[in-house]
From Swiss-Prot:
HAMAP family per the UniProt record, alphabetical: TruD
Gene it is expressed from: truD
Identification of the protein by name: tRNA pseudouridine synthase D
Alphabetical list of NCBIfam families matching this protein: PRK00984.1-2
SUPFAM superfamilies documented for this protein: Pseudouridine synthase
Organism: Azotobacter vinelandii (strain DJ / ATCC BAA-1303)
PROSITE patterns: TRUD, UPF0024
Superkingdom of this protein's organism: Bacteria
Active site, UniProt feature: D81
GO BP of this protein: tRNA pseudouridine synthesis
UniProt KW keywords: Isomerase, tRNA processing
Length: 352
């Protein structure tokens, strides 16, 4: 499947040019932002790890082997891509045990930068945000138009699509999810089950968001919407008064779309009509998610870009720095700016 089929239309029109992303790992740097004070004592050893050429699961397996402990004793907040230079936290459960010797885990692809004890393990999704530093090379673009587009993104945000990596190579995860949904079965292997359920859920969300981008109301609240703050999982219904809330213009409050689960859409008015229509079109996937025990949740439709800054180290290089909430994709920001040369089509996720 193509990018436009898996995501949807751009919000701001045609790209301002072309560029290459991820010519090397240093071109895509991700730092996990964790808002948890670590106590310095407890039965969990937290590790601040820098890795390149390894995804999060591979790094966890390496730490487990070096520590001589089962993989289930290793925890992390979010999944980071292999094709990047990333820094993130892991925790090791060591009740009554000394810190293990982890020298065997380290080489040029993995370095342990910090070790801290804490009383609790690191929970999935516990990080607050991810900081990105991206370097786009082989840039061929209209620089004034690119600068104007960046200012627009700073003021208005971008559609909060799930990025391409969620769906696997050529949408393979989604195709596999459809096959399981038709058979009304679930994969026995836990990681595969999680990956396919996430792909299906993400695709349905993207379908709804794509429809709203196409008509231009993805970033505007309307009666019947369910609204949520940027960093909150709770939501509330929008009436006429809520649609005039000044926090919408400040990019603190946003309309949301469905993360599919059991039951129908709790939205109202035109929003419910749209979400129900997508649900009918994709009934096998929607039913499969409900039968798998997924609960209906919401995700903001608009992605605010915090601390956005950019400069041009060379005439054909654009360097971007910004912070995104956990669970959001840096390349959905990039796709509103430029088309990527083929070597840069891989995406990097934050966390499911």
């Amino acid at each position: 499947m193509s990018e436009s089929e898996l995501l949807g239309p751009r919000a701001y029109g045609e790209a301002c040019g072309q560029a290459l992303l991820k010519a090397c790992a240093e071109d895509f740097q991700v730092d996990e932002v964790l808002d948890i004070p670590l106590s310095g004592q407890g039965e969990h050893l937290w590790l601040w790890v820098e890795k390149r050429g390894l995804n999060t699961e591979e790094a966890a397996r390496r730490l487990a082997r070096a520590a001589g402990m089962p993989l289930k004793a290793i925890s992390y907040a979010g999944l980071k891509d292999r094709q990047a230079l990333t820094r993130q936290w892991f925790s090791l459960h060591l009740p009554g045990k000394a810190d293990p010797d982890l020298v065997a885990a380290e080489d040029d692809s993995l370095r342990i930068l910090e070790r801290v004890r804490h009383s609790r393990k690191l929970q999935r999704g516990a990080h607050a945000a991810n900081g990105f530093k991206l370097r786009l090379t082989r840039l061929a673009a209209d620089r004034p138009a690119l600068d104007a587009r960046l200012e627009q993104l700073r003021r208005q945000g971008v559609p909060n699509y799930f990025g391409l990596q969620r769906f696997g190579h050529d949408g393979g995860n989604l195709a596999e999810a459809r096959a399981f949904a038709v058979r009304r079965e679930l994969p026995a292997q836990r990681n595969l089950r999680s990956r396919l359920l996430s792909a299906a859920r993400s695709y349905l969300f993207n379908r709804v968001l794509a429809e709203r981008v196409a008509v231009g109301d993805w970033n505007r609240a309307q009666p019947g919407d369910l609204l949520a703050f940027t960093d909150s999982r709770s939501f509330f219904p929008a009436g006429v008064e809520e649609c005039a809330d000044p926090r919408l213009a400040l990019l603190d409050l946003h309309p949301t779309g469905p993360l599919w689960g059991a039951g129908g859409s709790p939205a109202g008015a035109a929003t419910k009509v749209l979400e129900d229509a997508v649900g009918r079109c994709e009934a096998p996937l929607g039913d499969w998610l409900g039968e798998a025990g997924m609960l209906h949740e919401r995700r903001i439709l608009r992605l605010p870009i915090d601390r956005l800054a950019w400069h041009y180290p060379a005439i054909d290089i654009l360097q971007l720095e910004f912070v995104l909430p956990a669970g959001c994709f840096a390349t959905v920001v990039v796709r509103e700016l430029v088309d990527l040369w083929p070597a840069g089509l891989m995406d990097t996720s934050c966390v499911f």
